[in-house]
Each structure stands twice: as C-alpha cells, then as structure tokens.
Amino acid sequence: SMFKGWFNSSLSNYNAFVAALLNGKLKEMNIYMNEVALSTFSSFDTGTHPSERTQPERFYHGFVLGLLVELRGRYEVKSNRESGYGRYDIMLIPRDYNEGNAIVLEFKVLDLESEETLEDTAQSALKQIEEKNYDAELISRGISRERIRHYGFAFEGRKVLIMEQQ
C-alpha cells in the first residue's frame, strides 16, 4: 500500500543515529556518537572530575533522548522510569508491537575505581539491564524477549562506546 511504502522510506528522514539504531547497525551508531561528541561537545559538557560523575551521564542521556524524540510517532519514548528492580535510562516501546523492536538503553560513565576500559563500562551497563530486569515492563505488555534489544553506552569525556547485548 501507499502508506507502507511511505513508512519504509521514512527511515531516510531520521537522523543518522536513529536510522542506525532502528536498523541495528552498531558500528554506525558508534561512528555517529563519536563524531558528534568530538566535533560538538566540550569537556565542560561531558565533565572530567569524579565529583561530576552523574553530570556527564545526564548530559549524554539528554543528548540521546533529544535524538530519539523524533521517533515518538512510532515509539513510546520513556526516560528514567521504573521497571523490574530499578530505573532504566531510556526505553523505546513500539506503538505497533508487530512493527520494530523494543529497545532499552543504559548509560554509564567510566568509573576508574572499578573499570579499566570503555568496554568494561558498556558491559556493566548491559549487565545492569539484565540484573535489574528492565525488560519486565516490556514483557508484561506482551513483547517477546526476541523483540527486545539492549544497548550499553559507555562514556569517558568525549569518547563513547556503544555495545549491544548478544
């Protein structure tokens, strides 16, 4: 139908990050975030002192949330809500459960006391999604586990690493 054709081509109307996220293209998501962070953010935005640990996390959270707002026609975009045993950072719930995957995003800043690399931090974010059972809300709505994707975002200053739960 004409509507379906328009809908499929509408992916090209999304920003590069959103298009990569919806298509599960992890490499492109990483390239986009790192290019934007390097060219746009200052160390003032992203924080450099341990006392500012939650600030960079909030900054990146707000930035990614801003990128995702344009999805609100296709997804419920939820931020800092309770599910399972804690509060997830961002959850995208498809308005049509047969159209697209549900997505859970968790953000973490590299903690040099417990982590050595951005990989450790991204893994820690993914582990938090599992351990705190953030999928509970999605599963209670009838979305199957196969349709749920998890992304852990790790930050250190203007460096970003995004990993996906395999």
Model-derived regions: residue spans:
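Extended alpha-helical interface modules used as scaffolds for assembling large macromolecular complexes
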Residues: S1-N133, V160-Q166
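Nucleic-acid nuclease catalytic cores
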Residues: A122, N133-E164
